[in-house]
A protein has these predicted regions:
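Bacterial N-terminal signal peptides
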Residues: 11-20
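Structural signature of tandem-repeat unit edges
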Residues: 46, 67-89, 99-112, 122-135, ...
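Bacterial N-terminal signal peptides that target proteins for export
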Residues: 2-12
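LRR flanking "cap" motifs
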Residues: 30-96, 180-187, 191, 250
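Residue-level detector of functionally pivotal "anchor" positions at catalytic/ligand-binding pockets or at interdomain
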Residues: 358-385
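Consensus positions within tandem repeat domains that build extended binding/scaffold surfaces
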Residues: 92-94, 115-117, 137-140, 158-161, ...
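Boundary at the C-terminal end of the N-terminal hydrophobic targeting segment
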Residues: 23-30
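C-terminal tail/sorting-segment detector
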Residues: 394-404
Length: 404
């Protein structure tokens, strides 16, 4: 049953992308043809057009299933019936699947690349976007070869706009609109920086970015969407203090995640947040947490899966969070004097004799004072490992806040 659920999950989540890509029409409108390119008049008043290539032979039968083999140069302007039009858009599906084009030179008049406009359209690993381009539609630049593209002028990124590219860094900018799954399955992505001032990160933004090992989150961030970091590769992360909900699948399938620092304000932890986080050794749920889904921490336990490393769960709440998650073989640490209430509440009761009431909440900032000779690795409050902890400083150690 677990394996079936795992497969269904993959189908449901990836199906969103597949269906979205295939259910829209692949034919662009063509009002006139010049030099084997089709043009759609957008505005007679402004004299603007969108451009596409008739790969399916709807308007130019001799081009059916034939791809250009030289650099594609799209002009700034084109003349038809004595009127000069500015080329301001790549039409939806305009140059989709023209794999044989070595490179594309875009017009300086271009403002928009519409849905699927340059999806798998060229073999080059680099694309220059004119400064005038401010809009990338859904699936606009999907291309496994693409390693470098200038995006600083873009104000709108549609769903999956840069999915499946080979970019190595991502910079999420404030005052820019991002759809879902913009960097979905960018397998070469190693670093992501979300600019200060951003409050929301859409769902699936970095889903299955399997080499994403460094993430910088701003203090302004308050809402992170479902599965935003599913399948990533960082070993530690500190969430901003104003994040209150850990949404579905947020860190699922991150097999390297060992340490995470949760904000004091977190009050709800949803389904599969830590699904198959095999490297996670321990976790501390702050006192403010009111709800933890029963499968917030969950492992499928298929024959070829790694052995989960988690040994300890720490709950600072004197009132057990509703529902609660049970992980076999794990010790549940609760505040002193709270063993009985956890032992008789929801899924927490399943821990039985593995409930230990050893959390002392009387220390400064709810931290515990430990000796300097502790063997457990220490992390600062930003989730970075500290080789030589300083006396009097607060760290995360063994899943707990501690003071040296």
């Amino acid at each position: 049953m677990e394996k079936w659920n795992k497969n269904i999950r993959f189908i449901l989540l990836t199906g969103v992308l597949i269906l979205s890509s295939s259910t829209f029409g692949r034919t662009s409108k063509c009002d006139f043809i010049v030099d084997s390119l089709c043009y759609e008049i957008l505005s007679e008043e402004d004299h603007t057009v969108g451009v596409s290539y008739d790969y399916y032979g709807n308007y130019i039968p001799e081009l059916k299933y034939r791809c250009p083999t030289r650099e594609l140069v799209i002009p700034d302007t084109v003349v038809f019936n004595g009127t000069k039009y500015a080329v301001t858009e790549i039409s939806s599906h305009g140059f989709e699947d023209l794999f044989s084009i070595p490179s594309v030179k875009l017009p300086n008049t271009l403002k928009k690349i519409n849905d699927n406009g340059l999806c798998q359209a060229f073999s080059s690993d680099e694309l220059f976007l004119p400064p005038s381009v401010e809009y990338l539609g859904m699936f606009a630049l999907i291309n496994r070869n693409l390693k470098k593209v200038n995006l600083e002028h873009v104000k709108y990124f549609g769903n999956n706009a840069l999915s499946y590219t080979s970019l190595t860094e991502a910079f999420i900018r404030k005052n820019v609109e991002y759809g879902t799954a913009v960097f979905f399955k960018c397998s070469k992505l190693e670093k992501a920086v979300i600019e200060e001032g951003i409050t929301k990160l859409p769902m699936y933004t970095f889903r299955i970015c399997e080499n994403l090992s460094k993430v910088e989150l701003p203090s302004s961030l308050t809402d992170i969407g479902n599965f935003a970091f599913d399948g990533c590769a960082f070993d530690s992360i500190t969430l901003p203090q104003n994040v209150t909900i850990l949404r579905r699948g947020l860190f699922s399938e991150n097999h390297r995640l060992k340490n995470i620092v949760l904000p004091e304000k977190v009050d709800s932890i949803e389904y599969w947040v830590f699904l198959n986080c095999y490297a996670l050794e321990s976790i501390l749920f702050p006192a403010n947490v009111r709800y933890i889904n029963e499968k917030a921490i969950h492992f499928f336990k298929e024959p070829d899966d790694p052995t989960p490393q988690i040994k300890d769960i720490y709950c600072e709440g004197t009132t057990p969070p509703k529902e609660g998650c049970y992980v076999e073989g794990v010790t549940l640490h609760v505040p002193k004097g709270c063993k009985e209430i956890y032992a008789t509440t929801d899924n927490w009761a399943k821990y039985g004799e593995n409930i230990v009431d050893d959390i002392d909440l009387s220390g400064i900032h709810n931290s515990q004072v430990i000796s300097n000779d502790s063997d457990a690795p220490a992390y600062d409050l930003q989730g970075r490992k500290v080789a030589h902890p300083k006396q009097g400083e607060i760290y995360i150690q063994g899943g707990r806040k501690v003071m040296r």
